[in-house]
């Protein structure tokens, strides 16, 4: 999936943030089958960028194109189909349902990725298999983060958006998660855009941008 930004500026964003950014108000292309790291301090627009790419925010100027098509021309139904089949995201706030079990949250995905390992295999790799039948509200934030990651990886995608996916993981669990992500990116022939506050995970990135 090819993503192009042509002088995109979200509202509202301070002028000094825009001027110092590698992304805002520039011409930028996230190429197919590439891995991009977006690094910045809090409040610089990392989550905003991923929300724009996922189509849940449309308050911006400039042109955002997906595979050559202006995103402003996409209908609600177009976006639903894109999210169902082509783009997967792990939100910074995870967006899990606390009253459901970890497995029930994962199984909310309407279409499974035929290239992905089974849920139990991914959960075992991330060390959360024993928690799958617990309510999310009984899990630690690090455990919840891994549940949300499995949910993002279990659906089909050509583009994977990860918003600070390791913020509550120790080095060992971050390494396990990075390995799983790398494997799924390769199997899917997909692109990755990952945001971080500064730490660089064990993933080979083709481009690094500063907001």
Sequence positions of predicted segments:
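Helix-to-loop junction immediately C-terminal to a conserved catalytic motif
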Residues: 54
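ABC ATPase NBD coupling module
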Residues: 71-88
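Q-loop/switch helix immediately C-terminal to the Walker
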Residues: 93, 99-112
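Conserved ABC ATPase "signature" region
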Residues: 116-131
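Conserved ABC ATPase signature
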Residues: 135-139, 143-145
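Hydrophobic anchor residue at the start of the ABC signature
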Residues: 149
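Catalytic Walker B motif of ABC-type/P-loop ATPase nucleotide-binding domains
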Residues: 160-164
């Amino acid at each position: 999936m090819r993503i192009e930004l042509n002088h995109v500026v979200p509202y509202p964003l301070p002028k000094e943030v825009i001027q110092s950014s590698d992304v805002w108000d520039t011409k930028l292309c996230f190429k197919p089958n590439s891995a991009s790291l977006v690094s910045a301090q809090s409040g610089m627009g990392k989550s905003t960028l991923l929300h724009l790419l996922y189509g849940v925010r449309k308050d911006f100027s400039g042109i955002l194109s997906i595979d050559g098509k202006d995103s402003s021309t996409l209908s609600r139904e177009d976006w639903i189909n894109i999210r169902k089949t082509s783009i997967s995201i792990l939100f910074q706030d995870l967006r899990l349902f606390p009253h459901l079990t970890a497995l029930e949250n994962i199984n909310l995905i309407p279409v499974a990725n035929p290239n992905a390992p089974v849920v139990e295999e991914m959960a075992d790799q991330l060390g959360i298999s024993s928690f799958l039948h617990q309510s999310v509200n009984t899990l630690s934030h690090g455990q919840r983060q891994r549940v949300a990651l499995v949910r993002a990886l279990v659906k089909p995608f050509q583009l994977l958006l990860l918003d600070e996916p390791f913020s509550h993981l120790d080095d060992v669990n971050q390494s396990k998660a990075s390995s799983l992500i790398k494997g799924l990116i390769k199997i899917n022939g997909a692109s990755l855009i990952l945001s971080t506050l500064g730490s660089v995970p064990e993933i080979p990135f083709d481009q690094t941008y500063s907001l």
